[in-house]
Amino acid sequence: MSNFSHAVKYNVISSQLARHYYQLKNRSLKQIVFVATTGRSGTMSLVDIFNHIPHCKAEHEPYPAMFDEVLKAKCAGNEAFVANMYWRIKSVNLWRAAAGYHHYFESNHLFIKTYIEYAVEDFKDKVTVIHLVRDPVKVANSIYALQDFPGTEEGNKWWLDYTAQNNLIKIANYLDNDPEFKHPFYKGLWYWYEIEERVKDWRKKLPHVRFLDFNTEDFNNQDKTFQLLRDLNIDFDESALTEYVNTRANTRPHQKLSPPLPLEQANKMHQNFKTLLSSLPI
């Protein structure tokens, strides 16, 4: 799409008209599901499962993903830019994608970082959030293997900027200068804990929104996975979904530039990090 066509399609008036049109086409929509997670946590497994259930639709990081310049604006406190991107572009695309379905799921770890408050205002009581949690050492090691941890050019597009003033866990001085904690693995650990703090914070700010807790490791457990779907009030045929449980998706082995740290070393560093956090007034 040319810049001119994009500007016409997503100007304020066009966006308002398009949103109203797609809202009318979403009369059958019962629920829109988002995920509050770090990424590297199994969200693609959920996408695969959702897309094999009648009247359900799932997409992974659909346009606009709200990353890069949107995430950087959020980290810099430029809320006007983020709000404009949501209401002018993101909202329309969400309503369009959900049209014709009973349940729509967006798998996007940028949700908790850039646009949760706008999505809740937009979809109101239709919103459910899955708080998807993977072991912090596994998440940090996965990010470390990709070598795109916070602080790198690519990492700041997708994860978070550990130097941002609006972080809940402000330890940039340690991550930059401490002989122990300036190892890049710690930036992945910081990211995991920062996301968890943000989830806690949003749960307090949005007490009317339903959050469902789920562990990534439980995707290997058919009973727990099916219970999650029941908790989402989704009708499904267990026999039709059995083959999609226990599968791994989006492991990105071709993008991993470094071997992960040995588990013993990673666990020791995690313990060091927890000791640091416990000593700080966070």
PLM features: what roles do these ranges have?
Residues 44-47, 65-68, 112-115, 136-142, ...:
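Short catalytic/ligand-binding loop motif for oxyanion handling, primarily in non-cytosolic enzymes
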Residues 36-38, 105-110, 133-134, 215-217:
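Short His-Asn-centered micro-motif
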Residues 1-99, 240, 244-256:
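PAPS-dependent sulfotransferase catalytic core
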Residues 48-123, 154-159, 163-180, 272:
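PAPS-dependent sulfation machinery
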Residues 75-78, 146-150, 231-232:
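Short, hinge-like loop/turn segments at secondary-structure boundaries
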Residues 1-26, 168-188, 193-282:
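PAPS-dependent sulfotransferases, especially Golgi type II membrane carbohydrate sulfotransferases
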Residues 123-145:
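Conserved phosphate-donor/acceptor-positioning beta-strand/loop module used by diverse small-molecule
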Residues 33, 57, 128-130, 212-214:
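Hydrophobic/aromatic beta-strand patches that form the interior of the parallel beta-sheet core
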